[in-house]
Amino acid sequence: MQWDGSKNAGFTEGEPWLAVNPNYKTVNAAEAQDDPDSILNFYKKLIRLRKQYADIIKGSYTLLLPDDPQLFVYERQANGQKLMSISNVSKEEAAFYWPDGSEPERAELLLSNYDNDSGTESRITFRPYETRVYLLA
């Protein structure tokens, strides 16, 4: 584990039996902790969201667009609240169209791994590996 930018990436004061990756000064836990856009901090936000909407996480699960090769889209619903998770699982851009009957203008963007507008247009272009979670009214 690359803990920080110190000798041997902070892993050991002894001689490691495997070489430390040369990127240890910039790719390490200490740097990730300080970077609000790091994967570590994205997962922390995801965990907070899961705790905040615990009832929904235990609620019903509906897979949307099961045949789409690029987008993994599902809804979780409970107690009158609904979350929609949309993930582009490909290395190419992907177009998402809000389902008929949905009200994207009332959707609240709760989490994204990119800086985004709210995505309330009828069509959203997702960047490679982009994920968004919306609270639907």
Could you say what each language-model-derived stretch is?
Residues 23-25, 113-116:
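Short helix/strand-capping connector loops at secondary-structure junctions
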Residues 4, 64-66, 99, 112, ...:
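A structural detector for beta-sheet-dominated domains
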Residues 87, 116-118, 129:
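A conserved amphipathic helix/loop scaffold
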Residues 120-137:
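C-terminal beta-strand-rich structural cap/linker in extracellular carbohydrate-active enzymes
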Residues 34, 101-104, 118-120:
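Short, glycine- and charge-enriched coil/turn segments that flank and shape catalytic ligand pockets
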Residues 1, 74, 115, 132-136:
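Short beta-strand element of the conserved SAM-dependent methyltransferase core
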Residues 93-114:
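Beta-strand-rich binding/interaction modules
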Residues 1-83, 89-94:
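Loop/helix patches that line or flank the sugar-binding groove of alpha-linked glycan CAZymes
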